[in-house]
A protein has these predicted regions:
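Non-catalytic structural scaffold of enzyme domains
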Residues: 1-156
Length: 156
């Protein structure tokens, strides 16, 4: 099992002393694990946790753009954009699907970061350690599983 965590470390390393907004589910923001991670970097940057109740559901419904998601993001982000933001960390595995919608709201300024690169690197290390990392140059196969019962949403 490979756990995910918000990409706070890379954000703080890239923007020391910067203002970093972490968009995550309310549960993630409240969790002791997140609070400990935030505390680890509190002295190196201004880290602001933004609980985004309901944002994950936009992704699950396949609503990645449009007026409803734009209104939601504007309402959530506008109060934090009154001052410059250096980085926005996407603290939920669903949120990278909304990168384009978030970019349209925040403009070109803040860098939008997620933890997918770190997860991929950890997966590669674990597969190599267990001798399961594919070494040949031939293409492999991928199997995607989803409990969603709506093929038209999955097709997007």
């Amino acid at each position: 099992v490979i756990g995910t965590e918000p990409a706070l470390k890379p954000a703080v390393e890239k923007y020391p002393g910067g203002r970093i907004l972490v968009m995550a589910t309310p549960m993630t923001i409240k969790q002791e694990k997140f609070q400990a991670l935030k505390h680890q970097f509190d002295d190196r940057a201004q880290i602001i946790g933004l609980p985004c109740e309901g944002l994950m559901e936009f992704v699950e419904r396949g609503e990645l753009r449009g007026s409803a998601v734009a209104a939601y993001l504007t309402e959530k982000l506008a109060p934090y954009l009154r001052e410059p933001v250096d980085g926005i960390v996407l603290g939920c595995t669903h949120y990278p699907f909304l990168t384009g919608a978030i970019r349209r709201i925040v403009g070109p300024g803040p860098e939008i970061m997620d933890g997918s690169h770190g997860v991929a690197m950890q997966l590669e290390r674990k597969l190599a350690q267990s001798g399961m990392l594919r070494q040949c140059g031939e293409p492999g196969t991928a199997v995607f599983e989803n409990s969603l019962d709506e093929p038209e949403i999955l097709a997007r």
